[in-house]
C-alpha cells in the first residue's frame, strides 16, 4: 500500500489512467483469443474493434475513445474463464506472491494468458529478466494506484478474518464473470 500511495501522490490521475489504457490496449489479444476459445465471437469482434479504435483515435492506446466516445465495453476474458467454460473446477483458493488472490484454475490460466500476451513476447526477445519484472511491477503499481486502496480497505476493515473476506470477495467476483 505505501508504494502505490506514494506513486499516487506523485503521478497525476490522468497520466496513471493513460498508462493503464496503454497496457489494456496492448494486451488485447488475451481477451480477444479467450473470447474465441469461449465461442464468444461477438465479444472477439468487440475486442478487435476496441483495439483498432484505441490504437488509432486513442493515440496508440493511451486514450480510450472506444469506451468514452463509442461505448464499446471491454470484454475482460481470461484463460481461467475459458478453462471454466470447459468444466474445469475452480479448485483451491490461493494467494500468489506478487500476483494476489487466485484459484488453482486461475493460476493455470495465468500461464495461458502469458502465452497470449504480446508483452510476454517482447520481454522474452527484447528485455532482460530484470527489465521484464520492472515492467510488470510498474503496471501492477499503476493499477493499484487507480483502484484498489479503498476497495481493499472496505472489504477487510469490517471483517473478523481479513483473509476469508478477501477470499470470499475474490470468489464471488470470479463467479459473476
Regions found by a protein language model. Name each.
Residues 81-177:
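A structured, mid-to-C-terminal "fold-capping" secondary-structure block
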Residues 21-104:
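Mid-length scaffold segments of soluble, non-membrane domains
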Residues 5-9, 69, 139-143:
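Short amphipathic alpha-helical segments, especially helix-boundary/capping motifs
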Residues 1-35:
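Signal peptide-directed extracytoplasmic domains
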Amino acid at each position: 500500500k505505501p508504494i502505490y500511495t506514494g506513486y499516487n501522490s506523485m503521478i497525476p490521475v490522468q497520466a496513471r489512467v493513460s498508462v493503464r489504457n496503454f497496457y489494456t490496449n496492448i494486451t488485447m489479444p488475451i481477451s480477444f483469443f479467450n473470447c474465441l476459445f469461449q465461442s464468444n465471437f461477438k465479444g472477439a469482434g468487440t475486442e478487435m474493434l476496441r483495439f483498432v479504435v484505441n490504437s488509432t483515435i486513442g493515440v496508440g492506446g493511451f486514450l480510450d475513445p472506444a469506451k468514452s466516445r463509442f461505448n464499446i465495453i471491454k470484454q475482460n476474458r481470461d484463460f481461467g474463464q475459458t478453462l471454466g467454460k470447459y468444466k474445469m473446477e475452480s479448485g483451491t483458493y490461493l494467494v500468489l506472491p506478487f500476483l494476489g488472490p487466485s484459484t488453482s484454475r486461475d493460476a493455470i490460466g495465468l500461464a495461458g494468458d502469458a502465452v497470449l500476451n504480446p508483452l510476454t513476447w517482447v520481454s522474452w526477445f527484447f528485455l532482460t529478466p530484470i527489465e521484464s519484472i520492472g515492467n510488470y511491477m510498474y503496471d501492477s503499481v499503476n493499477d493499484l494506484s487507480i483502484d484498489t486502496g479503498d476497495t481493499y480497505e472496505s472489504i477487510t476493515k469490517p471483517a473478523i478474518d481479513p483473509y476469508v473476506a478477501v477470499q470470499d470477495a475474490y470468489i464471488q467476483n470470479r463467479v459473476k464473470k
